[in-house]
């Protein structure tokens, strides 16, 4: 199974593509889609969409796993990031991919074993689990890979996290 993990963001959207087979992970690609704050929001969203469209076309993931948004203060930021998340869902839907959502707590629990783990712990575990030479940077990339790992580990319960 090929999984595209996404950590949504408007300035930096992290992505990670992993192959999960026989209880083993193989990293296919990972990185960040960065947009400039000097660009208008519609242009930034277009940039994110076009890049995700390329990634989905190139790697043909079986599933797209997206981290749910969690904001407790800045509603303006939450709205713009929600737009970026919507663009990610749209890109996957246009390609008729299965879309799944996981909370940050679920992702940390799946990767570190503790739902309140620090970012550094997540990065370190991703490095170990995926046999990488160094922890992926920025954090958004490690988080996207963690979402993909979380989806792989959700096994028979994946249908519970499917976006309907």
Swiss-Prot record:
Top-level EC class as recorded in UniProt: hydrolase
Biological process terms in GO annotation: DNA recombination; DNA repair
Keyword Transmembrane helix: no
Keyword list, A-Z: Cytoplasm, DNA damage, DNA recombination, DNA repair, DNA-binding, Endonuclease, Hydrolase, Magnesium, Metal-binding, Nuclease
Binding site for Mg(2+) 2: 67
Chain's role: The RuvA-RuvB-RuvC complex processes Holliday junction (HJ) DNA during genetic recombination and DNA repair. Endonuclease that resolves HJ intermediates. Cleaves cruciform DNA by making single-stranded nicks across the HJ at symmetrical positions within the homologous arms, yielding a 5'-phosphate and a 3'-hydroxyl group; requires a central core of homology in the junction. The consensus cleavage sequence is 5'-(A/T)TT(C/G)-3'. Cleavage occurs on the 3'-side of the TT dinucleotide at the point of strand exchange.
Protein name: Crossover junction endodeoxyribonuclease RuvC
Organism placement in taxonomy: Bacteria, Bacillati, Bacillota, Clostridia, Peptostreptococcales
């Amino acid at each position: 199974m090929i999984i595209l993990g996404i950590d949504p963001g408007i300035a930096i959207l992290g992505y990670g593509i992993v192959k999960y087979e026989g209880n083993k992970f193989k990293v296919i690609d990972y990185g960040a889609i960065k947009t400039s704050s000097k660009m208008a929001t519609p242009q930034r969203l277009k940039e994110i969409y076009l890049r995700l469209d390329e990634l989905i076309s190139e790697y043909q993931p079986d599933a797209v796993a997206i981290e749910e948004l969690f904001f407790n203060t800045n509603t303006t930021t939450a709205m713009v990031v929600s737009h970026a998340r919507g663009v990610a869902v749209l890109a996957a839907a246009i390609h008729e991919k299965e879309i799944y959502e996981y909370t940050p707590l679920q992702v940390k629990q799946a990767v570190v074993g503790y739902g309140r783990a620090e970012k550094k712990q997540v990065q370190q575990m991703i490095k170990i689990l995926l046999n990488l030479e160094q922890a992926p940077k920025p954090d958004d990339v490690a988080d996207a890979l963690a979402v993909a790992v979380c989806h792989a580990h959700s096994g028979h319960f994946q249908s519970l996290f499917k976006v309907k």
